[in-house]
Amino acid sequence: MLTRGDKGQAVVELQEQLVALGYALPRWGADGDLGNETLSALTKFLADHGRGDEEPYVVAAAELELVHQVYAATAAACPVPVPGRTFYDLRKESDRSNIHGRRPWTQITGITLHQCAVDFGHEKPARWDSLWAQTAASLEGDFFLVHDLQALVWHGHGFNPTDVGLELEGLYAGIAGPPDGSATPQTPTPELIATAQGGIRWIYEQVKRHGGQLRYLHAHRQSRDSRRADPGQELWQAIAIPMMAELGLTDGGLGFKIGSGRAIPEEWNPQYVGSAY
């Protein structure tokens, strides 16, 4: 049972499930504080399911259970499958010091793609739990949920407040071709590409189901000049460009960048004629 004024994770869960079921909380969102907005949304939910609300300032155990049951049935019908050969939920094990707060679902408007610039090795989930991003995909085709999508994680500089970070395992050249440094770049595996694309679909659907809307697919280079090769030409062309076309997303267009970032170059997207690497 919950009472008006209660705070905590149980309230957040109730609020998120109400929003996912179409009962918007436009003023306060899932803030973890059981106030009049959430109680009014619950009253509407109960009415739609043939229940009265005899105690409008109390959420009875039976009412909570009904919300959970309806939400579970809706979630089970989600048309987008969980991405990856194996889906690793590392949220309980991940480094909490990488989380710097939470944001409402409506604030999540994009995904930032990153290259890890390292090969973590074959299927070692424990090595991913310190990642500075919410999600990741491995060369073998595994997907990692490292932090809640609502978690505020320092992964993309100016994109931190609005974007989910998606790390892609491996070291990749900024422009495909002979290496320009001491390290030899890798080639993206088909498993990595497929899992990253599935991950983008899954993140898109999760945000939508919770009342938000993704509009952008960014490269880390767009927010930081020192990330010039992030995520790199091959990953951008194999993952970002097809997914933008499929989901109606944008990278901001020709010349778009924020802060000290660099725009998407012509080498990554031939439509951006004259945009320098």
Segments the model singles out, each with a brief description of its role:
Residues 119, 172-174, 225:
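Feature marks short, surface-exposed loop/turn motifs that line or immediately flank catalytic pockets
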Residues 110, 163-165, 216-218:
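Structural preference for beta-strand elements that scaffold enzyme active sites
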Residues 115, 168, 219-221:
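A cross-domain feature marking catalytic cores of carbohydrate-active enzymes
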Residues 47, 53-94, 100, 105, ...:
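Basic/polar, cationic surfaces and motifs that engage anionic cell-wall
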Residues 2-71, 215:
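Short acidic, glycine/serine/threonine-rich helix-capping segments at coil-helix boundaries
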Residues 10, 69-160, 276:
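N-terminal catalytic cores of peptidoglycan-degrading enzymes
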Residues 14, 157-175:
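Short coil-to-beta-strand
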Residues 22, 46, 117, 170-172:
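Short, histidine-centered active-site or binding-site loop motifs used for metal coordination
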